[in-house]
Amino acid sequence: MKLIENWFSERYSDNLQLSFRVSDQLLSIKTDYQRIDLFDTYDFGKLLAIDGTVQLTERDEYIYHELITMIPYHMTKNPPQSALVIGGGDGGAARRLLDLGLNKIVNVEIDGQVVEVSKRFFPDLSSAFTDKRVNLIIDDGIKYVRKCNEKFDLVIIDSTDPEGPAEGLFSMEFYSDITKILSDGGVIVSQSGSPFYQPKALKLAYTGMRRLFKDVKVYTGFIPTYPSGFWSFTIASEDAMNPRKPAIKGKYFNEDVLDGVFKLPQFVKDLIT
């Protein structure tokens, strides 16, 4: 990817972009599925971009990974013991799940190059893949779920936005297949984009899950390097979801966050009603 005067920019629209001053471009490759770029930035450390969009930075990755793991961890009927992660090739979600004490984690990533880049440049995140409790599978997550005959307490959709290889991860057919592999009291969670800049992604996830699951909720969090800094997640279960009192804290997550993330601004409520 070509830089302009040592700046990497993620374009949100024809009129708006977020730019990071870059000290070095560490990697730029085209895989069978997408383009991967790795930059060393002045303010956020190493930055991983896929198809020109920020996936994570060293400085704020913990926020996203705690939100996509620690919130659903506390929404299952009982403390979960197993999880399926679709996407998440950087290893961040799996690492957080290990910290939460899960006994079995299956991580299915379609693009093996994402894993290799993470092993090379984000060793703390990718260290999860060396743990015997984690089974890393390089495969299409949609196909894996379709043929899966295991049950999981948590299913985490840690994907890119609903286009390209990730488009099918927001489909009714995929959500229907998920219902067959969730254990009693289990939950599914998916990142669902910026309510401000990507309202269609949120509506797609919410309406799809709403047709198949009895209880569906949206929660949000602050992620500085994502579009608008305001990000959504959609969580669903066949059972009523009531948060269990947390016995742990993260760097971002605590008891107040668990309560507060479900308090939605009116414009977000309007999107999903």
UniProtKB/Swiss-Prot annotation:
Source taxon at top rank: Archaea
Enzyme Commission designation: 2.5.1.16
Main localization (coarse): cytoplasm
Enzyme class: transferase
Active site: 158 (proton acceptor)
Residues binding S-methyl-5'-thioadenosine, per UniProt: 34, 109, 140-141, 165
Binding-site positions, spermidine: 65, 90, 158-161
Family, as annotated: Belongs to the spermidine/spermine synthase family.
Protein name: Polyamine aminopropyltransferase
Species this protein is from: Thermoplasma volcanium (strain ATCC 51530 / DSM 4299 / JCM 9571 / NBRC 15438 / GSS1)
Gene: speE
